[in-house]
Amino acid sequence: MTNIRKTHPLMKIMNSSFIDLPAPSNISSWWNFGSLLGACLAIQIITGLFLAMHYTADTATAFSSVTHICRDVNQGWIIRYLHANGASMFFLCLFLHVGRGMYYGSFSLSETWNIGIILLFTVMATAFMGYVLPWGQMSFWGATVITNLLSAIPYIGTDLVEWIWGGFSVDKATLTRFFAFHFILPFIISALVLVHLLFLHETGSNNPLGTSSESDKIPFHPYYTIKDLLGLMFLLLTLTILVLFSPDLLGDPDNYMPANPLSTPPHIKPEWYFLFAYAILRSIPNKLGGVLALIMSILILAIIPILQTAKQRSMMFRPLSQIMFWILTADLFTLTWIGGQPVEHPFVTIGQVASILYFSLILIIMPTVSLIENKMLKW
């Protein structure tokens, strides 16, 4: 008798994707983050759904409805903090996932990589709109500052901003539409994830050596299902510790004050996962230039495959490229720190140097270093 998982129309799709999928035998724990991102997305959708049952998208009641969730709803506080800190875990896994792709040359799977970049933009948009919903001080002013950046677009900028706001300022119409988009986008993300996996399974996974895995494959289950479960346990442990011991560690105290259009917070800053891009935006004095640099800080990922000059796919045996990669990582940490600092000396200068270094490393230094390594291979 044939196995039902191999014959049933629905189950055979699951079977060929998660059970009998031929996977490289040597992929390390850096390949765990795909499944962890799937787990994060599931946590966000489930907790978000329960929060939406009690939240009201109205400027008069949004802040108090979030307070009501935390105080009066059964286990509401844990649902709220799982959702808020779940977003941080989501971005942590995302950054590590992208870093893995850069280090091991996974960007050469161009369709998968490009869908991944679209996913990154979509997740960032979703997180930004979610941050506006509690309608605290940082929610309101964050929404005002970031949406206002679109006014830098020539000719249509001002009209575009007012169209997004639904009026002449961030108000009830803005909050309502942000809630609608924040609710629908995770489902669009889920669809994009399926496309991401579809393209990945067309080519098969990369591996740490960057070589072809065709000659040495093992079934995904039980080997990598068990490995992914271990990663999931670490993720849930970290998230649980964060939620139960210091749920407000990554938040902003200003967001515990209801939104007040007449009082500007001393330092307007987004959540920690946007700070690197925010620092790049602030380091350019020109508004349009800053917006372009902000977009390019993420979109630059799309041109990494074009800039690949190395003979070897992975950085595993390229020590000079490894050094440049870790300098880039340190630079991103620096940008994240600068994004959270006030706009004054010496932070402005450090931000400008770090921004120049960020683009220089990706566009010029790393491709040049790869060419040097190619020459060294011939010695």
Curated annotation (Swiss-Prot):
Residues passing through the membrane, by range: 33-53, 77-98, 113-133, 178-198, 226-246, 288-308, 320-340, 347-367
Note: Heme 1 (or BL or b562) is low-potential and absorbs at about 562 nm, and heme 2 (or BH or b566) is high-potential and absorbs at about 566 nm.
Keywords in alphabetical order: Electron transport, Heme, Iron, Membrane, Metal-binding, Mitochondrion, Mitochondrion inner membrane, Respiratory chain, Transmembrane, Transmembrane helix, Transport, Ubiquinone
Family: Belongs to the cytochrome b family.
Gene Ontology CC terms: mitochondrial inner membrane; respiratory chain complex III
Name used for this protein in its record: Cytochrome b
Cofactor field: heme b
Gene (name only): MT-CYB
PROSITE patterns: CYTB_CTER, CYTB_NTER
Residues engaged in binding heme b b562: H83, H182
Pfam families: Cytochrom_B_C (PF00032), Cytochrome_B (PF00033)
Organism listed in the record: Microcebus berthae (Berthe's mouse lemur)
Gene Ontology annotations of biological process type: mitochondrial electron transport, ubiquinol to cytochrome c
Residues binding heme b b566, per UniProt: H97, H196
